[in-house]
């Protein structure tokens, strides 16, 4: 269940880093 969130968190973190 948390697997999906754990797999999506790095993507969101990468996007945030790119935006910042």
Curated annotation (Swiss-Prot):
Q: Which residues form the Peptidase S1 domain?
A: 11-20
Keyword list, A-Z: Blood coagulation cascade activating toxin, Calcium, Disulfide bond, EGF-like domain, Gamma-carboxyglutamic acid, Hemostasis impairing toxin, Hydrolase, Protease, Prothrombin activator, Secreted, Toxin
Q: Where in the cell is it found?
A: Secreted
Kindly list the biological process annotations in GO that this record carries. Answer: proteolysis
Q: What is its EC number?
A: 3.4.21.6
First-tier enzyme category under EC: hydrolase
Instruction: Please state every residue range assigned to the domain named Gla.
Output: 1-10
Mark the residues carrying the PTM 4-carboxyglutamate: 6-7
Which Gene Ontology molecular-function terms are recorded?
Answer: peptidase activator activity; serine-type endopeptidase activity; toxin activity
> Which reactions appear under catalytic activity for this entry?
Selective cleavage of Arg-|-Thr and then Arg-|-Ile bonds in prothrombin to form thrombin
Tissue expression: Expressed by the venom gland.
One Gene Ontology cellular component annotation held by this UniProt entry: extracellular region
What modifications does the entry list under PTM / processing? Gamma-carboxyglutamate residues are formed by vitamin K dependent carboxylation. These residues are essential for the binding of calcium.
**Which family is this protein grouped under?**
Belongs to the peptidase S1 family. Snake venom subfamily.
A further note on this protein reads: Is classified in the group D of snake venom prothrombin activators, since it requires the mammalian factor Va for maximal activity for the cleavage of prothrombin. The venom of this species does not contain its own coagulation factor V-like.
Main function: Snake prothrombin activator that attacks the hemostatic system of prey. This protein is functionally similar to blood coagulation factor Xa.
Q: How does it assemble?
A: Heterodimer of a light chain and a heavy chain; disulfide-linked.
This protein is called what?
Answer: Venom prothrombin activator notanarin-D
Q: Tell me which species this is from.
A: Notechis scutatus niger
Q: What is the lineage of its organism?
A: Eukaryota, Metazoa, Chordata, Craniata, Vertebrata
């Amino acid at each position: 269940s948390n697997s999906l969130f754990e797999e999506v968190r790095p993507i969101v973190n990468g996007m945030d880093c790119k935006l910042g």
